[in-house]
Design a protein with these regions (language model features):
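Methionine residue identity
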Residues: 1-3
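Short, positively charged and aromatic/hydrophobic N-terminal segments
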Residues: 5-6, 11-15, 19-21
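Catalytic, metal-anchored helix/loop core of enzyme active sites in primary metabolism
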Residues: 22-430
C-alpha cells in the first residue's frame, strides 16, 4: 500500500496496517541490528512472529553477530556496510537464500526495497542521516532511534516528512512518552501533522490548535549525578559506562553520563513536536519511572510511566496505533515507589546540556557541529585520550571555531560534519 495522498491518509494507513492483523504482516528493516536497540528490536519481532517479518538487517562491521541474526531470522537481505567483512558474511550465509550487500550505498539501497513497510533506524551517530533521508523519500514509515539525524538536520527532516507525507514514530523512551501523552490531543506540529483532529472546527479560536505549554523531558542524571566537579575530573570510561537504570550501547551511555544525550533529546523533541526552545525543559528524575511529561495550556500535566525497559517504546513504535503484550522484565508496580523525585539539572557540572540548548537556539549548522565534536570527544574519552570534563570543553571550542552556516543543504551537512571532526581532533591534539 502506497503512502502517497494527503496527510490525513497517513493516520488511516497506520490504523489499517495494524488493525487488520489477520491479513497483513509488517515487513521490517532494522538499520543497526547488532547494536543495543537493534538487538532489542529483534527480540520484540521474535515475540510476535505473526505481526512482524524481519525483511532486512544491517551492521557496519559486526560480522559474527549479524551472521547469527541472519540464521535466526532468515531476512531477505543482509547488509554489512564495511566491505572488508563482505566475503566472511557472504560465505557464512551461502547455504541460505539471503542476499548479502555491502558498500557505502547499500544502506540507502536496502531501505527503498518495495516490500519494506517500516524502517527502524537503530544505528548510532551521524551515519544514520543519509539512509534516513532515503527511507523518507521512499515513503517508508520510520521508527526513529537514531536521534543524531534530527540533531544534525532536524529542519531538513521535518520538511521532508511534510513533503513525502511520512510517519516518524519515536523510539527513544522520552519521545515515545511525549508521543503517547499527545494521543487524543488536537495537535498538528513538527513531524506529526496527522495527529490533528480531522473533524476539528475551522472556526475555533487559533490558540486551541496549540494546547501544549511545554514538554518536560526527564533524565536519570547518570552515574555522576551527585558528583562534585572535583570528583568528576578523574572519572574513567568504565565508571561512566555503569548507568544506574538503563541498558544501552557504549556511545549513548557515555553521552548520558555527560548529559549530552539529554541535550540531544531536547533538540530531537524540538523537531519531532514542533516546539520552541523555551517550551522544552529537562527534569532530573533519578528513578527513571516517569519517562517524560507534557504540560498543557490549561495547566494539566500528562505523564507516561513504566519500568526502564527499551523494549516497551520499541514495541509501541512497531505496533502503533495498537499496543501489544510484551515480555518485559517485570511490569511497574506503582506501590513499590513511595517517592518519585525531580530536580533541576546543574548546567555548571554538566555543561553539555547547556551547549545543546545554545546550539538549538543559534540554529543553522550549530547542532551539526556540536554533534560532530561530541562524536569525536566521546570516542576519545572511551579510548582514554581525553578526560571526562574535557569533552564539553572541546565541544564548546569546536562550535566556537567553526564558521556559521545559516541554511545548510543535505550535502553541506556532510562537509560541515567532516570539518568539525577535524577541528575537534585538532583541539584535542589527536
Amino acid at each position: 500500500m502506497n503512502m502517497c495522498g494527503n496527510i490525513k491518509n497517513i493516520y488511516y494507513f497506520c490504523t489499517l496496517k495494524l488493525s487488520n492483523r489477520n491479513k497483513i504482516m509488517r515487513n521490517i528493516a532494522i538499520l543497526g541490528s547488532t547494536g543495543s536497540i537493534g538487538r532489542q528490536t529483534l527480540e520484540v519481532c521474535a515475540e510476535h512472529p505473526d505481526l512482524f517479518s524481519v525483511y532486512a538487517i544491517t551492521a557496519n562491521r559486526s560480522a559474527d553477530l549479524i551472521i547469527e541474526q541472519a540464521r535466526q531470522f532468515h531476512p531477505e537481505v543482509v547488509v554489512i556496510a564495511d566491505e572488508t567483512y563482505y566475503d566472511k558474511v557472504s560465505e557464512a550465509l551461502s547455504d541460505l537464500p539471503i542476499k548479502v550487500w555491502t558498500g557505502p550505498e547499500s544502506l540507502c539501497q536496502v531501505v527503498t526495497a518495495e516490500p519494506i513497510d517500516m524502517v527502524v533506524t537503530a544505528m548510532v551517530g551521524f551515519a544514520g542521516l543519509r539512509p534516513t533521508v532515503a527511507a523518507i523519500k521512499a515513503q517508508k514509515m520510520l521508527a526513529l532511534a537514531n536521534k543524531e539525524t534530527l540533531v544534525v538536520a532536524g529542519q531538513l527532516i521535518e520538511g521532508l516528512c511534510a513533503e513525502y507525507q511520512v510517519t516518524i514514530l519515536p523510539v527513544d523512551s522520552e519521545h515515545s512518552a511525549i508521543f503517547q501523552c499527545l494521543q487524543g490531543e488536537s495537535i498538528a506540529r513538527g513531524c506529526f501533522p496527522w495527529l490533528a483532529n480531522d473533524n476539528a472546527n475551522p472556526e475555533k479560536p487559533h490558540y486551541l490548535d496549540n494546547p501544549i505549554d511545554k514538554l518536560i523531558i526527564t533524565a536519570s542524571g547518570g552515574p555522576f549525578r551527585t558528583f562534585t566537579m572535583e570528583q568528576m575530573r578523574d572519572v574513567t570510561a568504565a565508571q561512566a559506562l555503569k548507568h544506574p537504570n538503563w541498558d544501552m550501547g557504549a556511545k549513548i551511555t557515555i553521552d548520558s553520563a555527560s548529559m549530552m544525550n539529554k541535550g540531544f533529546e531536547v533538540i530531537e523533541a524540538r523537531w519531532l513536536f514542533g516546539m520552541n526552545t523555551d517550551q522544552i525543559e529537562v527534569a532530573v528524575h533519578p528513578q527513571s519511572i516517569v519517562h517524560s511529561m507534557v504540560q498543557f495550556s490549561d495547566g494539566a500535566i500528562k505523564a507516561q510511566l513504566g519500568c526502564p525497559d527499551m523494549k516497551v517504546p520499541i514495541a509501541y513504535a512497531l505496533s502503533y496505533p495498537d499496543r501489544m503484550p510484551s515480555q518485559i522484565n517485570g511490569k511497574l508496580r506503582i506501590e513499590d515507589y513511595a517517592h518519585l523525585t525531580f530536580e533541576r539539572p546543574d548546567l555548571e557540572r554538566f555543561p553539555n546540556l547547556r551547549l545543546a540548548f545554545d546550539a538549538l537556539a543559534a540554529g543553522g549548522d550549530r547542532t551539526c557541529v556540536l554533534n560532530a565534536a561530541n562524536e569525536v570527544t566521546n570516542e576519545a574519552f572511551r579510548r582514554g585520550q581525553c578526560k571526562f570534563l574535557q569533552m564539553a570543553e572541546v565541544n564548546e571550542k569546536t562550535v566556537a571555531a567553526m564558521p556559521f552556516v545559516a541554511s545548510p543543504s543535505l550535502e553541506d551537512y556532510f562537509e560541515i560534519d567532516a570539518e568539525a571532526r577535524i577541528k575537534a581532533r585538532e583541539i584535542l591534539g589527536l
